[in-house]
């Protein structure tokens, strides 16, 4: 039962807009800023306050919009669903209730305008939660990440400058449930990319987003195009025949980019992430990814899977499926939402501009259009004047050209990392780059990408995690664009030589304490792809064996230390460099290596400030 049904915004089906376009719309942006400020200012005990809506995801672990006598699962967690098959659909309806409350506030605000009131009232009816297209423009507009104050339109039509509520949320007060979570129990506002002094470092955050942009675009493309079943698409785990990140894994990256600095900020901790207003821009885009993927794979929907971690909605070990209740969200006072009807976003009165040109089209028409749309927006572009045959071939497989008449083949190269999901209690990241010159400085030229692990733990759910010690999680970083840039072939022998010469390197980033990730395994895999004439979806060529390289980047089973005070490096950074000898990985413990010598000279100083 719920005291506040989730029905979506009013006004019929309207588009959620890209934040880049949204901030340029005078009425939408004005209403959004004012409405966001209004719900942020509400008493934190109010079910429709920003605090309570955000608190559904994690802390303060209290029932949301329930009668006082409603029983809940006796489990120390929020309602959020992670690492399980309901991750996409639960968050779909979660964003909808937020959008519903936000629009309700905007409609009240629109009535206060004394000029062009009819237009403002209509704009409020059309208002939907915007999305941040992280795969296309990872560095968002200044209004989202930089400007302390923004210009909006006042009720009399004049322009005014107001505090920007998109940058952060101010707790009033800090909730008692935050006690015992260092920094989070004293920060009076949400914090992004904090430095060692616990203060935001926005220039470094922008630099980090710029550095991660190409990899994020490539991950987005592969996630949408190369996950054909629900389990592999919906959540992160270790699945057979998978070489692309899941929706959840790509989602985790954004949490890591925004929240992780020298120490963890709010977006990096699952129990606090939703309090950062950027969370809602991010999750609107995660839902958009779900819609795009649905178009590519019509008819594929929620399958059965276990609740691994436990939440306020599901006890650990519960078997979940499309009929599972998506607590605490209800269609009516007594009818909980399930995943079954959520294939159609029109039920919640929203859509995305990506579908404007194919509204009402057949599933085949929509699939073909969205496939081309994804290719254009996130795919690899051909070289200018055909100067790079390898890049042109890659574009045929992962780009905008589908009018080829040839029978095309190539190896698709990916770094694959796996680890025991619950070995570490907190969020961390694995970062990959080339270190051919022995340098520890990361640039746009040698940076490959990262895998970000998004966690939020308490003593209770940590204890449950330890009972599931063998659960494995995996992530992927793609190498094709570098190989296409530097080589004229994707041939395994040439790629093997190239990767050894480039010295493929990794490092692990976490808080400023030392840990060991014993279960980490890393390899490079080449999968033979086949693209027949006129076909737009590459497929695995089963006549050619998959190639695995364990000697260009070892399957790391030894020590991966976080915290390098012993060698004079910035705390919170660890690095491993593949040695010149095949099959040898040099970890931080190998103090005699050139890599550690370089670290001791302070080579990672700037990098530590970025990551």
UniProtKB/Swiss-Prot annotation:
Cross-link 2'-(S-cysteinyl)-histidine (Cys-His) placement: 80-82
Pfam family for this entry, one: Tyrosinase_C
Positions of the propeptide removed during maturation: 380-611
Site (Cleavage): 379-380
Catalytic activity, as annotated: 2 L-dopa + O2 = 2 L-dopaquinone + 2 H2O; L-tyrosine + O2 = L-dopaquinone + H2O
Entry binding sites for Cu cation B: 251, 255, 283
Superkingdom assignment: Eukaryota
Residues annotated to bind substrate: 255
SUPFAM superfamilies: Di-copper centre-containing domain
GO molecular function, one term: metal ion binding
Amino acids binding Cu cation A: 57, 82, 91
Enzyme Commission no: 1.14.18.1
Cofactor entry: Cu(2+)
Ranges in coiled-coil conformation: none
Database matches in InterPro entries: Di-copper_centre_dom_sf, Monophenol_mOase_fun, Tyrosinase/Hemocyanin, Tyrosinase_C, Tyrosinase_Cu-bd
Post-translational modification: The C-ter is probably cleaved after Gly-379 since the mature active protein is smaller than the protein encoded by the gene.
Enzyme class per UniProt: oxidoreductase
Entry's Gene Ontology BP terms: melanin biosynthetic process
Keywords tagged on the record: Copper, Melanin biosynthesis, Metal-binding, Monooxygenase, Oxidoreductase, Thioether bond
Function comment: Copper-containing oxidase that catalyzes both the o-hydroxylation of monophenols and the subsequent oxidation of the resulting o-diphenols into reactive o-quinones, which evolve spontaneously to produce intermediates, which associate in dark brown pigments. Involved in the initial step of melanin synthesis. Melanins constitute a mechanism of defense and resistance to stress such as UV radiations, free radicals, gamma rays, dehydratation and extreme temperatures, and contribute to the fungal cell-wall resistance against hydrolytic enzymes in avoiding cellular lysis.
Stored PANTHER family: SHKT DOMAIN-CONTAINING PROTEIN, TYROSINASE FAMILY MEMBER
Recorded family membership: Belongs to the tyrosinase family.
Subunit description: Heterotetramer.
The name this protein goes by in its record: Polyphenol oxidase 4
